Swiss-Prot record:
EC number from the UniProt entry: 3.5.1.12
Record localization: Secreted, Extracellular space
Name used for this protein in its record: Biotinidase
Top-rank taxon: Eukaryota
Catalytic function, reaction form: biocytin + H2O = biotin + L-lysine; biotin amide + H2O = biotin + NH4(+)
């Protein structure tokens, strides 16, 4: 998505600023309800040879180029009244290092729980902390909370059974600075994604920090979003309403594009997610956003090599999209039909002359062929979505997925309803249950599951399944890498459903992505 598509974020901020100026009472009220956040998608300067061992000075010179850009963005954000800014994972030092070659890029990291420290005001307290000092000073200059990611080192003793042979731990670390430059806390990434340069902490860091403008925030990084620890545990145990999320995410369509999973997490848990991704389109890395459960301000651009700053007002108390919604008397016919299918009762429609009833078993008059195709490296079972309306079912193991749909017009495209209930084993191992309505890459069944970004097909639909987990992420992507929001989500008769009418652009993906964290 080009930067022009993110203009509503800045426009929303401008309109709100005008509203704030109406009266002092209005201003106090609005400031209590909203805060101003920023995320920066950064096209980082990378080491030309990350496998080569360089000096600390050479490493600092490369990182300075990225930190200079960070400071420019902080000052630009300060002009817009930003109170918290988030920068991406790997944005300062880059990636593809070995354990040895990354060492000159690492800062020493004292524990904020043991040491209260302001690196900008106390620069000589610890050696090898130049990056932390620079970030601390940025927070002071911008007068805002600042979240960034860097590599850190921590010496360990041979008596420590987990101590690596080289006598140090190396961590992929997020740091949080307050607006006065104090190091508030640090989070060490737990779920590493093929990162040989870093160690996994012995214990999961469950990190929250308090702000005067929005209360409590939680912190995690990139691949963590797919796992119970720390992401879900933070929300369950600490009543967190806001997440800061540095990431270096390579887009994987049709189910795990960066903005797609960011938005899904915000919607599933009813929280705000401030997500900053790295910007390297040639590597498939783009997609940042400020996501609330109901609205998103995002950036996705595979063409423009430049970075992008997103600024938006964010509710301090986000409102979620859950529940079964309207009463039966207010429901449209498609939702009444959906409820009848779930209950197994006949569905009746009244015309001018008489009432017509169909048994639930007869609603799916066209039973299309079942086929298999690879999607996201998993062997999905699918059925094609043909015709202007219908009710489809497809099952795998214990999961059955259903689609009740109407189409105002037929496009010259193939869509399919797919199901997968099993262990995902490529680029990570984790158990998923997925119901997915996707546009296929072509007209052949073997193209279903391919990566596509453009679509024309419009649907009004209910998508649901008998999931064995409560942790279900609603993925919703439309043509041109745009995000949409379901009209309704929730449980009905032990089935989880997603409902949508009136798509404004062609459907790329609508999916319910369930995670069974306890199964491995």
């Amino acid at each position: 998505m080009s930067g022009a598509r993110t203009a509503p974020a800045l426009f929303f901020l401008g309109c709100s600023a005008l509203a704030l100026g109406v009266s002092s009472a209005s201003q106090e009220h609005r400031e209590a309800e909203y805060y101003v956040a920023a995320v920066y998608e950064h096209p980082s300067v990378l080491s030309p040879n990350p496998l080569e061992l360089v000096s600390r000075q050479e490493a600092l010179e490369l990182m300075k180029q990225n930190l200079d850009v960070y400071e420019q963005q902080v000052m630009a954000a300060a002009q817009k009244g930003v109170q918290i800014i988030v920068f991406p994972e790997d944005g300062i030092h880059g990636f593809n290092f070995t354990r040895t070659s990354i060492y000159p890029f690492l800062d020493f990291m004292p524990s904020p729980k043991l040491v209260r420290w302001n690196p900008c005001l106390e620069p000589f307290r610890f050696n090898d902390t130049e990056v932390l000092q620079r970030l601390s000073c940025m927070a002071i200059k911008g007068g805002m909370f600042l979240v960034a990611n860097l590599g850190t080192k921590q010496p360990c003793l041979s008596s420590d059974p987990g101590c690596p042979q080289d006598g140090r731990y190396q961590f992929n670390t997020n740091v949080v600075f307050s607006d006065n430059g104090t190091l508030v806390d640090r989070y060490r990434k737990h779920n590493l994604y093929f990162e040989a340069a870093f160690d996994t902490p012995a214990n999961v860091d469950l990190i929250t920090f308090d702000t005067p403008f929005a209360g409590k925030f939680g912190v995690f990084t990139c691949f963590d979003i797919l796992f119970f620890d720390p992401a879900v545990r933070l929300l369950r145990d600490f009543e967190v309403k806001h997440i800061v999320y540095p990431t270096a995410w390579m887009n994987q369509l049709p189910l795990l594009a960066a903005i797609e999973i960011q938005k899904a997490f915000a919607t599933a848990f009813g929280v705000n997610v401030l997500a900053a991704n790295i910007h390297h389109p040639t590597l498939g890395m783009t997609g940042s956003g400020i996501h609330t459960p109901l609205k998103s301000f995002w950036y996705h651009d595979m063409d423009d090599p430049k970075g992008h700053l997103i600024i938006a007002q964010v509710a301090t108390n986000p409102q979620g999209l859950t529940g079964t919604g309207n009463t039966t008397s207010e429901m449209d016919p498609s939702h009444r039909k959906f409820l009848k299918i779930l209950s197994g009762d006949p569905y009746c429609e009244k015309d001018a002359q008489e009432v017509h009833c169909d048994e639930a078993a007869k609603w799916n008059v066209n039973v299309p062929p079942t086929f298999h195709s690879e999607m996201m490296y998993d062997n999905f079972t699918l059925v094609p979505v043909w015709g202007t309306e219908g009710h489809l079912q497809v099952c795998s193991n214990s999961l059955c997925c259903h689609l009740l749909y109407e189409r105002p017009t037929l496009s010259k495209e193939l869509y399919a309803l797919g199901v997968f209930d099993g262990l995902h084993t490529v680029h990570g191992t984790y158990y998923i249950q997925t119901c997915a309505l996707v546009k296929c890459g072509g007209l052949g069944f073997d193209t279903c599951g391919q990566e596509i970004t453009e679509a024309e097909g419009l649907f009004d639909f209910h998508l649901w399944g008998n999931f064995s987990t409560l942790y279900i992420f609603p993925l919703f992507l439309t043509s041109g890498m745009t995000l949409d929001t379901p009209d309704q989500l929730g449980w009905e008769n032990d089935h989880y459903f997603l409902r949508k009418r009136g798509l404004s652009s062609g459907l790329v993906t609508a999916a319910l992505y369930g995670r069974l964290y306890e199964r491995k």
